[in-house]
Amino acid sequence: GKTREEIAFLILGRASTPAEQKGDPIDAMLRIIGTRKREIIQRSCGDLIEFLDPSYGLDAVGGYDQIKQELMKIAATIKTGDRRLAPMGLLAVGPMGVGKTFVIKAFLKEAGLPGVVLKNFRSKWVGSTESNLERVLKIIRAMSPIALVIDEGDRSLGSGEGGDTDGGTSSRVIARIKDFMSDTDNRGHVLTILMTNRPDKLDVDIKRPGRLDRK
């Protein structure tokens, strides 16, 4: 049989770019596998999700000292692997342009969590929105541990907008996401991070503890 290094060399020599071959061969092999896995997932999901690949931690964030301290504590808790102590979700609130996404990406780096942004899962075709959402949620569960990031939550998860004009799709989507966020089987596996600049427009029930534990 071949050693791990020999297997890594064979993989690196046949299925990688020069950038992927840098550093330790085992680490490089794992990077290649991770990259290929993401490519397959993105192809299967179309433009429904986007991966976050932060290259910096919270030390790159200027100011926000109190917020950074709290996020460092949460990151440390997540890294212990104790599911009982992990929060179900985080709510990031602030006006546009204050750096919410930058801070969240830095937090994910500190916590060692990959992140996926929920994107255009809504569709003009009847039934497609809900099937799109189910497909994304199944993939996210399969990729755990992971962070599910929902940007502009006031738009996608607003308090019932569209319920009377889209056949109830909006209400069913919000209900499904609330169920997912409060599913205790996800604790320590899927961390939901909801970002918004208008928390007053969010469905009230979404903001309760057990879905978004930290604000």
List the predicted regions and their residue ranges.
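Interdomain "pre-motor" coupling segment immediately N-terminal to P-loop NTPase/helicase cores
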Residues: 1-50
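A diffuse structural propensity rather than consistent per-protein peaks
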Residues: 27-29, 57-60
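AAA+ P-loop ATPase central domain
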Residues: 53-54
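Walker A/P-loop NTP-binding motif of AAA+ ATPase domains
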Residues: 58-215
